[in-house]
Amino acid sequence: MEELEQGLLMQPWAWLQLAENSLLAKVFITKQGYALLVSDLQQVWHEQVDTSVVSQRAKELNKRLTAPPAAFLCHLDNLLRPLLKDAAHPSEATFSCDCVADALILRVRSELSGLPFYWNFHCMLASPSLVSQHLIRPLMGMSLALQCQVRELATLLHMKDLEIQDYQESGATLIRDRLKTEPFEENSFLEQFMIEKLPEACSIGDGKPFVMNLQDLYMAVTTQEVQVGQKHQGAGDPHTSNSASLQGIDSQCVNQPEQLVSSAPTLSAPEKESTGTSGPLQRPQLSKVKRKKPRGLFS
């Protein structure tokens, strides 16, 4: 199950708007099973299953359908991908959720080969270590990365001020007065930000701003966490290990026929090609920015 655990960690969060409420969710599906993490910003629920659980649950919920577990997993991936990846193209399935004691049940209803298809994700409260792995540690890493970014930008602004000062000392004057700026004072800027911008900037709401604006950074931080963990475990080259182990359903379900057999006579399902909810992940790459020459604001 290590593949599912690492694959889930490196997935972005998605924002789900259901009839009952809104949720944050991430999922990783392969031919061997799936892992799902869901949160309403109050609690976090988790489910991770293998093919044996998929097969048993499919029999209980869909008595008229018979298929290998991989076919059901591919179908679930096809249903979840529009919901998690592209809100502009809604899923053909209907989703609803219920909270029962410490469990959250995410119910799915759709059609498969002309017959109703049902699925229930049975998510239990996530362990503290799982919450730390997927939320606390990544969010701390993101905060440190953003702080470092702010310091780099402040340094760049100071360098720009020195450059402008050098132009002025050389006798240059500003042609357009509207472009005039005061020297950057970091402490004053931070104090003003705390007073004027902080309330709006840290408005969490239902979690949608976090999902819409920060997932690239989130995935970069979690990818780094996985690579560091692999180095500590002596797993060899993390790039090689990641590309081999985190293919997900893209590599395992391509050209996977559903091979469905119904209790109704002469019913067969068309073959489908599916790609994974979590395809091959592109690691963030940093490129050097070529500094541009001044455009002659001064003459």
Swiss-Prot record:
The UniProt record lists the keyword Phosphoprotein: yes
Keywords: Chromosomal rearrangement, Chromosome, Coiled coil, Disease variant, DNA damage, DNA repair, DNA-binding, Nucleus, Phosphoprotein, SCID
CDD domains: HD_XRCC4-like_N
Effect of residue 13 to A: Does not affect ability to participate in V(D)J recombination
Modified residues (Phosphoserine): 132, 203, 245, 251, 263, 287
A cellular-component GO term for this protein: nonhomologous end joining complex
Post-translational modification: Phosphorylated by PRKDC at the C-terminus in response to DNA damage. Phosphorylations by PRKDC at the C-terminus of XRCC4 and NHEJ1/XLF are highly redundant and regulate ability of the XRCC4-NHEJ1/XLF subcomplex to bridge DNA. Phosphorylation does not prevent interaction with XRCC4 but disrupts ability to bridge DNA and promotes detachment from DNA.
Keyword Membrane: no
Variant or mutagenesis effect after changing residue 65 to D: Abolished ability to repair double-strand breaks (DSBs). Abolished ability to participate in V(D)J recombination. Decreased interaction with XRCC4
Effect of residue 195 to A: Does not affect ability to repair double-strand breaks (DSBs). Does not affect interaction with XRCC4
Consequence of changing residue 111 to K: Does not affect interaction with XRCC4
Subunit structure: Homodimer; mainly exists as a homodimer when not associated with XRCC4. Interacts with XRCC4; the interaction is direct and is mediated via a head-to-head interaction between N-terminal head regions. Component of the core long-range non-homologous end joining (NHEJ) complex (also named DNA-PK complex) composed of PRKDC, LIG4, XRCC4, XRCC6/Ku70, XRCC5/Ku86 and NHEJ1/XLF. Additional component of the NHEJ complex includes PAXX.
Pathology linked to this chain's protein: Immunodeficiency 124, severe combined: A form of severe combined immunodeficiency (SCID), a genetically and clinically heterogeneous group of rare congenital disorders characterized by impairment of both humoral and cell-mediated immunity, leukopenia and low or absent antibody levels. Patients with SCID present in infancy with recurrent, persistent infections by opportunistic organisms. The common characteristic of all types of SCID is absence of T-cell-mediated cellular immunity due to a defect in T- cell development. Microphthalmia/coloboma 13: A form of colobomatous microphthalmia, a disorder of eye formation, ranging from small size of a single eye to complete bilateral absence of ocular tissues. Ocular abnormalities like coloboma, opacities of the cornea and lens, scaring of the retina and choroid, and other abnormalities may also be present. Ocular colobomas are a set of malformations resulting from abnormal morphogenesis of the optic cup and stalk, and the fusion of the fetal fissure (optic fissure).
Identification of the protein by name: Non-homologous end-joining factor 1
Gene encoding the protein: NHEJ1
